[in-house]
C-alpha cells in the first residue's frame, strides 16, 4: 500500500455520503507498499480501507479483483469484502481515479518472522487456492515471464548504477528461466494472490486473521504463488536464506493441498522467476517513483540475492 494521490477531507466526506457506512471521523494515508493510494478511514460505523487505483492496475480489470475478493470471502477466506454504495456499486471514481472501499481486517502484519508463522502462511495459501476453485473468470498474469524482458528494457542501464553488471546478469538469468518455464498445461492453475508478502498477511495470536491487497491476483500456476512466498518469507534481513522457514511453508501448504511431482520439480525455476519479477518491478519503481510520494521504496538488490540463491539450489 502507498499514497500517490492526496485527498481533502471535504472531498472524502462528499464521497462517503453515498454509502451507508456512517460519517467520517478521521482518515490517514498508509505508506506501506508501492502500487495504489490507500487510506484508513474511521467512520461512526467502524474502520474501512479506501483504495485509489494507480499505475499498473488496469481499470477494466477492477471488477475481476473485487469479484474475486467477494467470492473468496463467501467461501470462508478472511479477505477484504468490497463495500457497495446505496446504488449497489462497489467501484466508483474519486480524484479522477477508480476507487473502492473495502472492509477493515483485524490483526497486524508480522515484523519478526519465524517457522510457526511460515507454517500458518503455507496453510492459508493452500486454502486460498482451494477457495478460488469455481471462480471461473480468467485474468492472465500481466507480470508473467513475457512481461519481464520489456520491463528490463524499460529500465535501460539504470540497474548498473545500483550494481555493476546487473542488467547483463538479469538478462542472462531471464533467458535461462524462460527456456525452463513450464508450459501452460504442465502444472495446476487457478486463482493466485501473486503478491502475498508479509505486509499483506495479518496475524492475531499466531494465527492468520486476514489476507489483503489482491490487486495483483491473477490466473496462473498455483505453485508460482508458492514460489513468490518462498522468496518473500524465507530470507532473514533480506539476505540470508532460512531453510526452516521454507520447510515450514512447504509443510503447511502440503498439509492442505499436496503438490504434484511436477510442481515440486518446477519450484526451483518458479522461484528464480519470482525473484526476477520482483527484482524488475522494484528496479522500475526505484527509478520512477516520484520523490514526493508517500511510499516506501523497496531495494531491488534484495531480489538479486534471492535470484542467486535459487540459481544455486537444486531443490526447495
UniProtKB/Swiss-Prot annotation:
Highest taxon listed in the record's lineage? Bacteria
Q: Which CDD domains would you find in this protein's record?
A: HomoserineK_II (cd05153)
Gene3D superfamilies linked to this entry: 3.90.1200.10, Phosphorylase Kinase, domain 1 (3.30.200.20)
Q: Which InterPro entries match?
A: Aminoglycoside_PTrfase (IPR002575), Homoserine_kinase_II (IPR005280), Kinase-like_dom_sf (IPR011009), Pseudomonas-type_ThrB (IPR050249)
Example of a GO MF term: homoserine kinase activity
Recorded catalytic reaction(s): these are: L-homoserine + ATP = O-phospho-L-homoserine + ADP + H(+)
Quick one: which pathway? Amino-acid biosynthesis; L-threonine biosynthesis; L-threonine from L-aspartate: step 4/5
Q: Name one GO biological process term.
A: threonine biosynthetic process
Might you give the EC number(s) for this enzyme? 2.7.1.39
Extract the Pfam families matched here. Answer: APH
Keyword terms of this UniProt record: Amino-acid biosynthesis, ATP-binding, Kinase, Nucleotide-binding, Threonine biosynthesis, Transferase
> Which PANTHER family did the record assign?
AMINOGLYCOSIDE PHOSPHOTRANSFERASE DOMAIN-CONTAINING PROTEIN, AMINOGLYCOSIDE PHOSPHOTRANSFERASE DOMAIN-CONTAINING PROTEIN-RELATED
The record ties this protein, via NCBIfam families, to: PRK05231.1, thrB_alt
What family is this? Belongs to the pseudomonas-type ThrB family.
Q: Which HAMAP family match?
A: Homoser_kinase_2
List the protein's name.
Homoserine kinase
Which species?
Answer: Gluconobacter oxydans (strain 621H)
Amino acid at each position: 500500500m502507498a499514497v500517490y494521490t492526496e485527498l481533502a477531507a471535504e472531498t472524502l466526506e462528499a464521497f462517503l455520503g453515498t454509502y451507508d457506512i456512517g460519517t467520517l471521523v478521521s482518515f490517514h494515508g498508509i505508506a506501506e507498499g508501492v502500487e495504489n493510494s490507500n487510506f484508513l478511514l474511521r467512520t461512526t460505523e467502524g474502520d474501512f480501507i479506501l483504495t485509489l487505483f494507480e499505475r499498473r492496475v488496469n481499470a477494466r480489470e477492477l471488477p475481476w479483483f473485487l469479484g474475486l475478493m467477494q467470492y473468496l470471502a463467501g467461501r470462508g477466506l478472511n479477505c477484504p469484502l468490497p463495500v457497495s454504495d446505496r446504488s449497489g456499486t462497489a467501484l466508483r471514481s474519486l480524484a479522477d481515479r477508480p476507487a473502492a472501499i473495502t472492509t477493515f481486517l483485524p490483526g497486524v502484519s508480522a515484523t519478526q518472522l519465524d517457522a510457526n508463522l511460515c507454517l500458518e502462511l503455507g496453510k492459508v495459501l493452500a486454502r486460498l487456492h482451494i477457495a478460488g476453485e469455481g471462480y471461473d473468470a480468467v485474468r492472465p498474469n500481466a507480470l508473467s515471464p513475457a512481461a519481464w524482458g520489456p520491463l528490463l528494457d524499460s529500465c535501460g542501464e539504470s540497474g548498473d548504477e545500483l550494481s555493476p553488471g546487473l542488467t547483463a546478469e538479469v538478462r542472462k538469468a531471464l533467458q535461462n528461466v524462460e527456456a525452463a518455464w513450464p508450459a501452460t498445461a504442465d502444472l495446476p492453475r487457478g486463482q493466485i494472490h501473486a503478491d502475498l508478502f508479509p505486509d499483506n498477511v495479518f496475524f492475531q495470536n499466531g494465527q492468520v486473521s486476514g489476507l489483503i491487497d489482491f490487486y495483483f491476483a491473477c490466473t496462473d500456476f498455483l505453485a508460482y504463488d508458492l514460489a513468490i512466498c518462498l522468496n518473500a518469507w524465507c530470507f532473514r534481513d533480506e539476505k540470508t536464506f532460512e531453510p526452516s522457514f521454507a520447510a515450514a511453508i512447504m509443510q503447511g501448504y502440503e498439509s492442505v493441498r499436496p503438490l504434484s511431482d511436477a510442481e515440486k520439480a518446477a519450484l526451483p525455476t518458479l522461484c528464480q522467476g519470482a525473484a526476477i519479477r520482483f527484482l524488475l518491478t522494484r528496479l522500475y519503481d526505484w527509478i520512477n517513483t516520484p520523490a514526493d510520494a508517500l511510499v516506501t521504496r523497496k531495494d531491488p538488490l534484495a531480489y538479486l540475492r534471492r535470484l542467486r540463491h535459487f540459481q544455486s539450489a537444486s531443490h526447495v
